[in-house]
Amino acid sequence: MVHRTEPPDGGWGWMVVLSAFFQSALVFGVLRSFGVFFVEFVAAFEEQAARVSWIASIGIAVQQFGSPIGSALSTKLGPRPVVMTGGILAALGMLLASFATSLTHLYLSIGLLSGSGWALTFTPTLACLSRYFSQRRSLAMGLALTGVGISSFAFAPLFQWLLNNYAWRGALLLVSALSLHLVACGALLRPLSLTEDTAVGGPWAQITSLLCHGPFLRYTVALTLINTGYFIPYVHLVAHLQDLGWDPLPAAFLLSVAAISDLVGRVASGWLGDAVPGPVARLLMLWTTLTGVSLALFPVAQASTTLVVLAVAYGFTSGALTPVAFSVIPELVGTGRIYCGLGLVQMIESVGGLLGAPLSGYLRDVTGNYTASFVVAGAFLLAGSGVLITLPHFFSCISLSTSRPQDLVIEAPDTKIPLPKEEGLGEN
């Protein structure tokens, strides 16, 4: 383990960025492209859209709800063994899914087992990355998360090609092989010890203090609302386009168009997050609002050109909000608590990930089309952007990380934990 007084803002941190790049591709790139499998599962098991939607929703929810476990294990054991174990579980889940004979099997294999593997990989990696960077944190986060955009661009048509040539069982076998590369990504994570770590207490003390922290709780509410609508296009856009008369392959390529725009948005947002003065939460509110508007406009579009424009707009803004969403957390809780803070955020926002796609599928079953599904998804994002305005210093011209007054001690049951006042812990 490397010991430092403060984040190095580079060095081995760039290898952690590389690891996070491939991990984000192999976790959320797969999840975002799973809409290609959606139509196949509906036909294979002769089930309603709402029931099939639970496969991806359970996977997202387990990944997020199990994040505190991955965070606590990483605090004790370091991120490397935890992430490598998660890679094995993710691959095993996809392998078992290829033998499924019912939706229940897919709920357990992809949703529960692969979701558990994703919980042990994604959050510890991003937390490790946040500890390596301070001044360039948003840029590093943006570069790392471009893996989602690149893989979404590549995986959607790739998965459709695999389905056409090997059917869904053979395609899942190959996705399992891809997921096994998460083990190699975990090997790149070198633990970093910071001076701040000695003052934050153990995992339970950190969790207790965060649950008493008003701004942190409001932020988790905002992300939960955002998460409810965020993934809807990646689950139901292909099906929506097929309802409009599109062939499966062109519909999958529209996801790729959104993925290219997503990639550009992540890099641009990461650069802006470090370059623009003021709290990063303001940028997050802007991108969230624009994402919600573009989602709500999808049912209005009928022409191919209009749908492509909306896909580009949605891809850019949804990609742009992701790196700044993760960059706000260390500003609120400090780098010493980033493992537990990020884990708690992922757990609480899992409620949105669990309910979003099934709600969208239910609205489609009731109304006969996806109009209400996309409008409601956009409304959830707009509601989340409204909550972001309540964060401390939102209207200030100075970022939370630029001022560092004296420490403040917050009392939790049976423990006293010194916390930096600049991180908003004195505000409720």
UniProtKB/Swiss-Prot annotation:
UniProt keyword annotation of Ribonucleoprotein present: no
InterPro entries: MFS, MFS_dom, MFS_MCT_13, MFS_trans_sf, Proton-linked_MCT
Compartments (UniProt record): Golgi apparatus membrane; Cell membrane
Membrane topology: Multi-pass membrane protein
GO cellular component entries: Golgi apparatus; Golgi membrane; plasma membrane
Xref: Gene3D superfamilies: MFS general substrate transporter like domains (1.20.1250.20)
Cytoplasmic side: 1-10, 395-428
UniProt key word Transmembrane helix: yes
GO molecular function: monocarboxylic acid transmembrane transporter activity; symporter activity
Listed transmembrane segments: 11-31, 52-72, 81-101, 106-126, 139-159, 172-192, 221-241, 244-264, 283-303, 309-329, 338-358, 374-394
Pfam families named in the record: MFS_1 (PF07690)
Alphabetical keyword list: Cell membrane, Golgi apparatus, Membrane, Symport, Transmembrane, Transmembrane helix, Transport
Family: Belongs to the major facilitator superfamily. Monocarboxylate porter (TC 2.A.1.13) family.
Function, as annotated: Proton-linked monocarboxylate transporter. May catalyze the transport of monocarboxylates across the plasma membrane.
Name this protein carries in UniProt: Monocarboxylate transporter 13
Source organism of the structure: Rattus norvegicus
